């Protein structure tokens, strides 16, 4: 049975806990906020979007916050702002299905025509040049991604079935972070793309069990769930009443799906190339020959998942990065930064304006792309024992073996410890 341990982070987006890694997938202060601040805001979109092709590699896709934030940011800040106002579009919504509005659904094509513009009038299409390759070895988790809610208000973290001390102070914190949510159209886009390219998405029983579990209902979008159910619908034999209700359900959600499809076409969002790869990222990239403009590296912490933080893995990423591309990650570990440098990257800090401090690392081939270089102290830290990086010579080692090898190397190293280095640096500066 698949283990699923969700909770609400302080910005109203869903965070997850992994029993396998005894770690959280996202910052408890705000899962969606973290995605924006570490993977979206550091990118110069005004320059970036002038490229003929935009290829994004999302490593450890999870429930998709980084890819969805990327698409949502472009959609809200470039597409919708530049969309022609030639036609007046009236928003109209129908109530959830009841017996008193089923005829309106059956006969009311005029609702559909009035609520959606039938013509594509946005001439500068950004989305047809965007390609996203999302990698995660947890297929069920990535299948859940389009169902996940964001921007939930007045939420309560009740019935949490795990204990993780590091987040207790955050999930019980009354101070919430204000942040925009992912537009429902982006979630529907991801739903459609996964459905189109995954053979078992709509018929996966484990996924079906999870999204229909009442315990988790507060975390999932009811509209996406309804559309999903309409894809799975089968008549109930010998039960006309249930069959009738299912038919009503399908009429409503198929209408809703058509409405979403119209909006995708209107903004040309359907032109995005989205590929989901459910496998070991090392294996996927060894068989991949694409060059990427942006790489989001969002694996579990280096000590929990060192196979995706090794020197050899960064060498592999170097081979897959465009000359003016960027790698973005939340990690500021000296061992990770040292591995990046030896792998041929220029590295710098990711500045968090809200917190007024550095909260991540950016790597590039071009030094001119580094806006916030490392300080003298940080550069010196790379030469201490803390800067000894992980090794995975054949890119197929287990995490335990990689950790053990680094532990032995650190123990046998003549390098100064990070604590002694800090003391020495403070005395001389």
Predicted regions and their residues:
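SAM/dcSAM-binding transferase cores
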Residues: 2-5, 361-429
């Amino acid at each position: 049975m698949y283990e699923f341990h969700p909770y609400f982070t302080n910005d109203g987006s869903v965070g997850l806990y992994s029993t396998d890694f005894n770690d959280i997938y996202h910052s408890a202060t705000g899962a969606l906020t973290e995605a924006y601040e570490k993977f979206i805001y550091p990118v110069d979109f005004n320059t970036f979007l002038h490229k003929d092709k935009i290829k994004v590699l999302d490593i450890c896709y999870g429930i998709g916050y980084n890819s969805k934030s990327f698409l949502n940011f472009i959609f809200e800040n470039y597409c919708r702002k530049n969309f022609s106002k030639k036609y007046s579009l009236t928003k109209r919504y129908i109530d959830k299905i009841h017996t008193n509005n089923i005829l309106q659904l059956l006969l009311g094509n005029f609702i559909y025509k009035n609520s959606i513009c039938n013509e594509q009038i946005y001439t500068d299409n950004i989305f047809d040049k965007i390609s996203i390759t999302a990698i995660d070895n947890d297929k069920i988790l990535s299948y859940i991604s389009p169902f996940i809610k964001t921007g939930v208000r007045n939420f309560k973290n009740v019935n949490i079935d795990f204990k993780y001390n590091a987040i207790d102070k955050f999930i019980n914190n009354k101070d919430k972070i204000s942040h925009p949510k992912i537009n429902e159209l982006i979630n529907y886009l991801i739903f459609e793309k996964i459905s189109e390219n995954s053979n078992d998405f709509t018929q996966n029983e484990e996924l079906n069990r999870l999204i229909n579990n009442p315990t988790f209902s507060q975390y999932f979008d009811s509209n996406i769930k309804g559309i999903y159910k309409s894809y799975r619908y089968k008549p109930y034999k010998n039960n006309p009443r249930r069959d009738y209700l299912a038919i009503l359900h399908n009429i409503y959600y198929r209408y809703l799906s058509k409405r979403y499809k119209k909006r995708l076409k209107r903004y040309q969002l359907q032109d995005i190339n989205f590929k989901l790869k459910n496998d070991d990222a090392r294996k996927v990239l060894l068989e991949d020959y694409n060059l990427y403009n942006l790489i989001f590296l969002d694996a579990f912490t280096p000590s929990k998942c060192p196979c995706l933080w090794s020197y050899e893995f960064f060498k592999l990423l170097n081979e897959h990065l465009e000359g003016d591309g960027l790698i973005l990650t939340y990690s500021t570990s000296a061992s990770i930064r040292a591995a990046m440098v030896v792998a041929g990257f220029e590295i710098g800090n990711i500045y968090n304006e809200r917190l007024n401090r550095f909260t991540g690392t950016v790597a590039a081939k071009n030094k001119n792309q580094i806006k916030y270089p490392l300080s003298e102290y940080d550069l010196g830290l790379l030469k201490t024992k803390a800067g000894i990086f992980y090794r995975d010579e054949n890119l197929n080692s287990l995490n335990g073996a990689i950790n053990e090898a680094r532990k032995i190397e650190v123990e046998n190293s003549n390098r100064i410890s990070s604590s002694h280095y800090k003391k020495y640096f403070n005395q001389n500066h």
